[in-house]
Structures are given as C-alpha cells and as structure tokens.
Regions:
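Outer-membrane beta-barrel porins/channels
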Residues: 24-49, 94, 110, 114-299
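Outer-membrane beta-barrel translocator/receptor signature
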Residues: 57-136, 158
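Generic structural "secondary-structure junction" signal
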Residues: 41, 52-57, 73, 239
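Short coil-to-helix leader/linker segments, especially the first N-terminal amphipathic alpha-helix
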Residues: 6, 14-16, 55-63
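Bacterial Sec-dependent N-terminal signal peptides
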Residues: 1-28
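Residue-level detector of alpha-helical transmembrane segments in integral membrane proteins
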Residues: 1-2, 61, 259-260
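Generic secondary-structure boundary/loop-capping signal
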Residues: 36, 47, 52, 61-62, ...
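A generic structural signal for short, non-catalytic loop/turn and secondary-structure boundary residues
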Residues: 14-16, 43, 74-76, 222
Length: 299
C-alpha cells in the first residue's frame, strides 16, 4: 500500500519544483507589453522542430500539448515523462543603434499514462505567456529647443499554466479531449523619467480550459490522413495590483494597490490536417487568436 501513496506525493513535489524552474522570462519582444504578454507558441519538444505545429498529430511516444485529444497513442504499459528547455537569440537594429540578446532556460515538464483502455491522462506545467522588453524614448521639451526628456520603459515576468489533460478514444479513429488547469504569474512594468520611477506589479491568475477533437480517416495504402480541431474560450484574468512611485530628487514615495482594466485570455481556434507515411510526416495548422477584449497592461 505504501507504494501507491508515494506516487501522488512525488507528483506534487515534481510540480512544485518544476514551476520554480520554468518561472523565468522567455521573451524580449516590445509587443509583450500588451495584454497578458507574448504567448508561448508551443511547449517545445518534438513539435518545436516542425514549426510548433501538430494539432492533427497523434503518434506513439508523442505527448501532444497542442491538442488534448491527440494523446491516445501513448504507450499503455508505462508512464511517459517529458522535460524540455528552450533558447532564443534576437538582434535589433534602428538607424545606427544595434542590440542583441540571448535567452534560454528549462521551460516545461509533463507526465502521461493510460488510465483505462480508452482513457488517457497527462499532467504538466509550461509557460503560457512572457513579458520582457526595454524601450527608451527621447522627446524634445516644448519651448526649450535642444533640451530633451528621456523615458525608459521596462517589463518582465510572465504567466505559467499547470494543466490536467483527459482524452477519450470514442472509437478506433475518433478521440476527444479536454485540458483543465490554472494560469498564474506576476508581471512587473516600470516607467522611469529623469529621477521619477513608477512601477506596476500585477499578480495574475485565471482558470484555463481548452477542448480538442482528433479524427483519423479510413485510408488504404501507406498514406494515413488525420485532422484535428481545438478551441479555447476567452476567460477573465484576476489581478492583485500594486503601484510604487519614487522620486530621488524630492524623496517622495507612494506604495498602494490600484485597479486596472479587466484583462482576458484570448479566444483560440485551431485546426490541422496531417499525412504520414513510413518515412514522411506532412502537416499544416491554422490558428486564430482573438485579442479584441484586451488593452495594454498599463491600463
């Protein structure tokens, strides 16, 4: 009996440790200042080498996080563990100014297995979005030619999702699945102008859900065709916000909570189709994200 009690404890410990590992900034794009940040295109793994597509892929040995219905080909005799990391390099140029950055860190883990002959499950944690930018502006002071005011905008942090996937093989060719979980994290944004600094810190959390369907067509020969469809509704993000103001020249300081405009996770609709043979895998995805309910994080 002790053996069966240790498994959930080990999983809980693994989740806690993995969340602390992946809770690192993973972008340097200025557009990450809007909404909930720059969305993670994928959890990585084998699909990263295919352009982060795979909604229609359901293959043995693959833990598909793009479509919750596409995990019904996992090995039925053992647990499957998946741990990964990501790295990125970016170079920016504007007139005669150049800058570059390199980022890399562990970013995901997942554990999957078959529960019953037609029921498969997976638990994991991975980045959902990331905020990371540094923008400097220069404006001439009105009425004072040759005098300029410099402003510095900075942002860091991100959101991370913990999820539980359940997939059911309704028939030999048709599978359905659902992802349920939470998204949480902290985003810090600041604006510096001369000696004044305003910092916004927002702790965010939201319920997360997406749904998937996967179907394998009845074909003859070596070619196997399949299609997948996923949908994630737009859900509200809850905030706990804090504003800090400081001015080194006047020794003024303010630290208080504040209310920002309501933010939402974007609605996501995705579809994919794939063709596989013994040597080739050809697949294509279409993804639609609706950001219309969001504004800049500053508001």
């Amino acid at each position: 009996m002790k053996h069966y009690h240790r498994i959930p404890l080990m999983l809980c410990s693994f989740c806690a440790v993995s969340l602390s590992i992946i809770a690192q900034n993973n972008t340097n794009l200025p557009t990450s200042m809007y909404g909930v940040g720059e969305l993670s295109t994928s959890d990585g793994g084998r699909y990263a080498g295919m352009g982060n597509i795979g909604i229609a892929l359901n293959r043995t040995g693959f833990q598909n996080t793009l479509n919750p219905a596409a995990i019904t080909r996992m090995d039925s005799t053992c647990f499957i563990f998946d741990v990964g990391a990501s790295a990125s390099y970016a170079r920016y140029s504007f007139q005669n100014d150049h800058s570059s950055s390199f980022m890399g860190n562990p970013n995901r883990f997942s554990i999957g297995c078959r529960i019953l002959p037609r029921w498969y499950a997976m638990i994991g944690a991975a980045p959902y979005s990331s905020v990371g930018y540094i923008i400097q502006t220069e404006e001439e002071v009105e009425g004072m030619p040759g005098s300029y005011t410099y402003s510095l905008f900075e942002g860091s942090g991100g959101l991370y999702r913990c999820y539980l996937t359940n997939a059911f093989a309704l028939t030999k060719r048709l599978s359905v699945g659902i992802n349920l979980g939470i998204i949480l994290g902290t985003v810090t944004q600041s604006e510096t102008q001369e000696s004044a600094i305003v910092e916004y810190e927002s702790s965010k959390r939201a319920f997360y859900a997406d749904f998937g369907i996967h179907y394998e067509f009845n074909t003859t020969g070596n070619q196997k065709w399949a299609a997948g469809l996923v949908f994630a509704p737009s859900l509200q993000v809850n905030h706990e916000n804090n504003l800090t103001y400081s001015n080194s020249s006047t020794s003024e300081g303010v630290d208080k909570s504040y209310h920002s405009r309501t933010q939402y996770l974007p609605m996501h609709i995705g579809a994919g189709i794939s063709m596989t043979t013994e040597r080739w895998v050809v697949t294509t995805d279409y993804n639609y994200l609706d950001w219309s309910r969001n504004t800049s994080s500053y508001t």
